[in-house]
């Protein structure tokens, strides 16, 4: 198969290689997926770059955990009728060496999720890490029907999906963006109230839409927003944080304690397997009824995977995808 891989960590152009590797074979309980589109996440580029001193977990790594494609072979114990089924894939390179930046990837059966016929491969390849993280942030502490959910970074990959999932789940969503110039990019049908963090007094602006406080916070930068979250959370609220800018974060401990606020930290590789499966079911169901859309940014052929990684590292709008040749 044609694939891209790295045998050591470093800058994308220095370590990513392309060529042919043996076709993988599915083992018991596994399926092989013929990949059409591979999704690139910040975690993929951080692993490749040795972020936070991480080392190579395997001698050779095919990067990327997310993808869409077609099941073309199954291992023992898997229903043979899965062959030919369109799927979206999550976790392909989570505690596994060979991910989705290749013509074929092998994953446990349940990590190849049936993709409804009317949904495109680009959407499917965009659901894995950001979608499952968003789902966990919104629903880990129970249903949100009738609740107020504050989503920081509502235009981001996780934030956008979190807002859409919360809306699908019956919540009223308040979103934040960094600058007032971004306000008109937010869909008011999903996020009826959006606050720009540069407005001067974002806490008062949020409180204007939630006088008794917000019940859930989906947090993209705990170190930057800890004081703001403290100012707007309701009694027994949950702050679910999947990111931060500073490794060490100061918290307004006593005010949060007196409000019985729960702080939940989210690392998607280690979510419970049952939670991932439920997230996959809900993401597919929401997407099937048109409740989820994804902003697609740049697309790169597999041969240009280093450019795709550099694009993710540089930041910018939209999901970065790699198309895999047939």
Residue ranges and their predicted role:
Residues 153-154, 221, 244:
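NAD(P)H cofactor-binding loop motif with strongest signal on the N-terminal glycine-rich segment
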Residues 76-77, 175-185, 198, 221-226, ...:
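Short glycine/proline-centered loop/turn elements that form peptide/ligand docking sites
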Residues 224-291, 324-326:
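Glycine-rich phosphate-binding loop and adjacent beta-alpha segment
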Residues 125-199:
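Mid-domain Rossmann-like dinucleotide-binding core that forms the NAD(H)/NADP(H) cofactor-binding site
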Residues 291-295, 306-326:
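C-terminal capping/lid region of NAD(P)-dependent oxidoreductase domains
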Residues 22-40, 51-93:
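Glycine-rich beta-strand-centered segment in the early N-terminal region that forms part
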Residues 80, 90-153:
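NAD(P)H dinucleotide-binding glycine-rich loop of Rossmann-like/cofactor-binding domains
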Residues 201-212:
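Short amphipathic alpha-helix with an adjacent loop that forms part of the alpha/beta core around
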